[in-house]
Structures are given as structure tokens and as C-alpha cells.
């Protein structure tokens, strides 16, 4: 069969480290859909509408990251809980397959770098 891509304007989850967010003209976003299907798929994360400023319950499609210009980003809707973001992070690692190439030491090294890249600094 043929592949599928999300089209049109839709909510998305900016899923990029803070350094990238502040220095790049682009963002990496994960699309959301209100079509709740394949809930057992490990790359899908359910988001309750009331927990995220959304109109409808939605699913984060972690297997379909999109790079987009910040000029194409719409309004801010809300922030996901740390618990939900952990689920998204895990689903994203599974979607990319990158985790299968890392041993425990490499995972800790990557985690340490991620903490540095996501540190919030005052300007």
C-alpha cells in the first residue's frame, strides 16, 4: 500500500530541544490527530483534550515528525504534562529506531547531552 502523510493545518507538538528552539528558524513538530485509531501502536500517544488546551481528544503521531518554519507555526495551545511528554519521548525513540543502537552507557551520555540542550537559561 501507499504511505500516508498528515495534511492541512492541525495541532502539533513541538518536539525539539530548547537550544534548537531558540537558534533555528525551524522547529520539529509531531502531528496530532483527533482520529483515535491504533491506540495500541507504540508510536501513538493519547492526549486528553482538557489536559492540553485542545478541542478534541487527540493522538500524537510520533512516527511522523515534521520540520517546519517557525513562520508556519500557529498559536500556542498549551503544554503537555511531564508524564505525557515521557510517553511521547519513549514513543519517539521507538519510532526512530535509534534506541536500538545505544547501549546503557550511550543512553546515559545522550541523556546528559539532552539535559544540557534543554536547560532553560535567562537571557
Locations of the language-model features?
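Compact nucleic-acid interaction/catalytic patches
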Residues: 2-9, 13-50
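C-terminal terminal-subdomain/extension
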Residues: 49-114, 123
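Cationic, low-complexity basic patches in intrinsically disordered or flexible, solvent-exposed regions
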Residues: 117
Amino acid at each position: 500500500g501507499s504511505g500516508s502523510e498528515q495534511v492541512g493545518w492541525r495541532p502539533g507538538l513541538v518536539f525539539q530541544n530548547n537550544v534548537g528552539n531558540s537558534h533555528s528558524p525551524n522547529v520539529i513538530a509531531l502531528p496530532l490527530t483527533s482520529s483515535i485509531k491504533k491506540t495500541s501502536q507504540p508510536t501513538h500517544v493519547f492526549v486528553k483534550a482538557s489536559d492540553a488546551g485542545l478541542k478534541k481528544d487527540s493522538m500524537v503521531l510520533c512516527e511522523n515528525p515534521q520540520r517546519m518554519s517557525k513562520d508556519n507555526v500557529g498559536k500556542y495551545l498549551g503544554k503537555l504534562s511531564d508524564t505525557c511528554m515521557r510517553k511521547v519521548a519513549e514513543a519517539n525513540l521507538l519510532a526512530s529506531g535509534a534506541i536500538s543502537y545505544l547501549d546503557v552507557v550511550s543512553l546515559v551520555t545522550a541523556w546528559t547531552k539532552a539535559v544540557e540542550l534543554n536547560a532553560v537559561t535567562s537571557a
